[in-house]
Amino acid sequence: MYRLAVRDQCKCALQRTLQQTTANNRQFGGSSSGSGGREQGRRQQEEQGQQGDQGYQGYQSLPPHMREAGFGKVVLFVSPLAAVGGVITYAKYDDDFRKLVEKNVPGAGSVIKVALQEEPPFKGITKNVNDQIDKVKSGIETVTSTVDSVTSKVTGLFGGGSGDDKSKKSKVEPVKATPAEEKRPSKPSEVSKTEAKPVSKPAAAAAPAPAAKPKDNPLPRDVVELEKAIELSAQLAVKEYNVAIGVLKGFNDDVRKVVDKAVENGENSLWTTLKNRASARDTAVATAERAAREAQEKIVACEIALSAAATAQNAKKVEAVRDKIKKLVDHIGNVKDELYRHKDTASVSDKYWRNVEKARNYFIDEIESIFPGLSLADKKLNLSKEDLDLFILHAYTHVLAYQKELQRLQTDGELRLKRAIDSVRGDNDSEALRAQLEYHLEAERRKLAVENQKKIFHIHAESDKLLRLQLKKQAEAHADHIKDIVAQRETDLTRSFKRELEDKLATEKANYKLQLAGMLGKLRGMDAALAERADAERTANQAQALWAACQALWASVRAATPGVHYKDRLRPLKNEINAIAKVAKGDDLVAAVLESVPKEAQERGVYPEDALRERFLNVERVARRLALVPEEGAGLPIYFLSYLQSLFILRPDNPISKDELENKPFDYSKLDTYDILNRARYHVDRSDFLQALKYMNLLQGASRKIAGEWMKEARLMLETQQAANTLMAHAAASGLLYL
C-alpha cells in the first residue's frame, strides 16, 4: 500500500513537471522575441493560452497555467522539484519501485540515471553555442511530440473520464473502447510549436504561421491483433473468475450442511462428496488463474509493442488502446479481488470440515484401540458391563480434559487479544511476534498432549490386559499352593485336632449357641424394621398413586379436549374410577366416595365446565325468549310477546346487588326470569356453577323446562367434581403422613 501511494504521488509530480516545462518554453519564446514584438508575442501567448485551456478543460488533474505572482509562484516551482527529488531518492533504494516508474513513465529511466550520476547528463552536446541553438531548434519538434505523448500517457493514467467514475462490479461485461478524442485534451504540440517559433525567428513574431497538424498513422498489424486477443483473453478470464466465484460460494454454503448431515447420520460417503467438491473448487480457481495469467502475458506483450510503435502521429490511437487495456486490467483485478475474498472464506470452511473429519477419525481410532472389534457404524453398540464402565470413564476423562483445555484456551485467547490490540496501538513492537510465537508453541503443545494422551490410553489398555492375565495366573498359582499347604497341614493337625476336639467341643457348642441366639435376635429385629419400612414405602407409593389417579379424574371433569364440540366431549369416567379403586384397594373412605359417584357419570361421562358454559349461553338465550310462557305452553301471541320482550330488555352491567354478594338477607321471590338468568350468567362467567345452579332452580314456567337438561348436567358435574375433590384431599392428607 505504501508503494502504491508513493507511485500515485510520483505520477502527480511528473505530471506537474511536464506542465511546468511547457510553461517555461512559452516564457522562453516570449522573452527572445525582442522589445519590438513583445506586445504582439504577449497577445499571441494569451490566444495560445486560451486554446490550451479549451483543450485541457477535460483534464482535471493538471494544475492551471502559472501566473506571475509572489509566493505562489515559488511554491509552484519548488513543489514539483521536491516531489521529483523524493521519487528519485526512493527509487535509489527500491529497485521494484524504480522499475515500476520506468515502465509507466516514459523517459523516467534517463532522468533517474542522470540524477543518480549513472551516466553523463549532457552527453553528445558540443560546446559551440550556435550548434546548441540549432540543436534546440531541431529538438523542439521532438520535445513537443514527446511532451504530447507523455501528457497523453499521464492523462490516460490519472485523468478522470466518464467511465472512471462508475462503480465497478464483480461480474464484468466486455468493455468497448471509448474514442480517444472524447477523453484526450487537445495536443499541446501545437501550442509548443507556436510558442517556440520566436526563439529562432524573432522577426516573424508579429505574424506567426499556423502549425501543420500531424497526420495520424495506423497502428501496426501485430498491435491490432494483440488488442483483439487481449479483449478475448480478458473476457475469458472474467468468465472463468465468475465461474470460480460461483463454485466457491456453493462450496461455502454446502460445507456446513454436509458436515451437520454427516455428523447426525454418520454417513461416510458425505466426506467423499466434500473432497470431490474441494477438488472441483481448486480446479475452477486454477483455471481462472491460468486464464488471467494468459491475459496478463498478452497485455505485457501489447504494452511492449505499443511502446515500440508509439510515435507522435499515432499517439491518439496508442492512448486509446492503453485506456482500453487499463480498463480491462481494472475489471480483471476487481473480479480477482472478489475471488480471493471468497477463496479466503473457502479456506476457512475447508479447515473446518477437515478438522471435523480429523477429530472423527481420531475418536474412531481411539475407541477401536480400547474396544477391538467394535463398529461405531452400528445403531446399537453391544458392550458388556465392564466395557461400558470403561467407555464411560474414557468419555468422562475426555470431557474433563476438554473443559480444562477450553478454559485455558479462553484465558490465553483473551491475553493474546490484549497483546494484539496493544501491538496494533504501537505499545510494543515485539508483542505481535511474541503472541504469534506463543500461539504456535501452544498449538505444538496441544498436538503433543493429544498424541501423549492417545499413547497413554493405548498403554493403559495394554496394561489392563496384562494385569488381568497376570492376576489370573497368580490367583491360580496361589490356589494350587494353598491347596498343597492345606493338604500337608491337614495331615499334621488331624491328630492334634482329634485330641482337642473332644475337650473343646462342649465349650464351642455352648459359645456357638449363645452367638446363634444373639444373631437370631438381631436378624428378627432387622426383619421387623425392614417390614415396617416396606409397609411405609408401600403406603406412601399408594398415596402418591392415589393422588395421581384422583388428579386424572379431576382433570377429566374440569377440562375438556380443545378443538372438539361439547357434544363430542363426553368420555366415560369408568377408567379413572377403576384406576382409583385399584390403587386404593381396601380404603373404606375411597370406596364410599366412589360409590357416591353417579352411574351416569361413570358410564357416559360428564360435560366439563367449558361445555356447560357454552350450553348455558344457548339455554339463556331460549329461556329469555320464553320468559312469559307458562310450563304447560301457550298460544302463539304469548310466544311472540315473550320474544319481543326479550329483545327490549337489556342486560345490566351489575346484575347482582352488593347485598347479595355479601350474603345479606334478600327476598328472592321478587326476582323475575331475566334477573335470575342475569345472576346465573354472572356466576357461570366466574365458574361458580353451584351458585348458578341455585339461581336456575328459581326459574318457573317454560324457562325452567328449557333449563332442566342443563341443570341436570350441571348437578351431575358438581357431584362428580365434589367426589374428585374429596378423593384428592384424602390422597393429599395420606401423602403428608410420610413426608
UniProtKB/Swiss-Prot annotation:
Major location (coarse): mitochondrion
Membrane-topology descriptor: Single-pass membrane protein
GO biological process: cristae formation; mitochondrion organization
Domain of life: Eukaryota
InterPro entries tied to this protein: MIC60
Start-end of Low complexity biased regions: 47-61, 199-212
One Pfam family, short name: Mitofilin
GO molecular function: ATP-dependent protein binding; protein kinase binding
Coiled-coil ranges from the UniProt annotation: 283-339
Region of interest called Disordered, as start-end residue ranges on this chain: 23-63, 154-219
Keyword Transmembrane: yes
Keywords carried by this UniProt record: Coiled coil, Membrane, Mitochondrion, Mitochondrion inner membrane, Transmembrane, Transmembrane helix
A GO CC term attached to the entry: cytoplasm
Subcellular location(s) of the protein: Mitochondrion inner membrane
Compositionally biased spans, kind Basic and acidic residues: 163-198
Residues passing through the membrane, by range: 69-89
Cross-referenced PANTHER family: MICOS COMPLEX SUBUNIT MIC60, MITOFILIN
Function: Component of the MICOS complex, a large protein complex of the mitochondrial inner membrane that plays crucial roles in the maintenance of crista junctions, inner membrane architecture, and formation of contact sites to the outer membrane.
Subunit and interaction comment: Component of the mitochondrial contact site and cristae organizing system (MICOS) complex. Interacts with the mitochondria-shaping protein Opa1.
The family this protein is said to belong to: Belongs to the MICOS complex subunit Mic60 family.
Protein name: MICOS complex subunit Mic60
Species whose genome carries this gene: Drosophila melanogaster
